[in-house]
């Protein structure tokens, strides 16, 4: 099942997983297929990013962000990511992508995607930063405003030292990219 098939399956089963509560996890089960592997017969690097996308979309659907974004003219966007691979996911191996919204600050949201093998070991971890872009206003929306528009009254926890380091690194790399553009 390639990207579109996995996306369709995730969307068709989202209601069975119930509403997403900030602070909880999205868990999507997969098997490493022949279309997922590289020449080492394990999940290729690009596939990790695509599967993390599915975890994010699952959260966005279940929290109501997709519907809200369409009404408001907003667009959820990823700004960057950092990944680390600690175990390989071999062909035919079962695994889960466990995704969560960790915290936010201003217009920036930190997400986490763990790739968990069927024996409970973490195979990879991806941290993401993103935001919600207001197309009509041509600006990013403060995440507290997004949370309020979703009818939630959740406050973010302070970023951990690792998350703060990631945010700072991302901002530095983003500045570098804008200089060379």
Which residues make up each language-model segment?
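HotDog/MaoC-like acyl-thioester-processing domains
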Residues: 1-16, 22, 89-96, 100-181
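Short amphipathic
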Residues: 23-33
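Short coil/loop residues immediately preceding or within conserved phosphate-binding loops
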Residues: 27, 78-80, 110
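Acidic, divalent-cation-chelating loop motifs in proteins
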Residues: 36-38
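Active-site helix/loop of acyl-thioester processing domains in fatty-acid/polyketide metabolism
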Residues: 47-70
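Charged, low-complexity intrinsically disordered boundary/linker segments
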Residues: 71-78
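Short structured motifs
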Residues: 79-85, 97
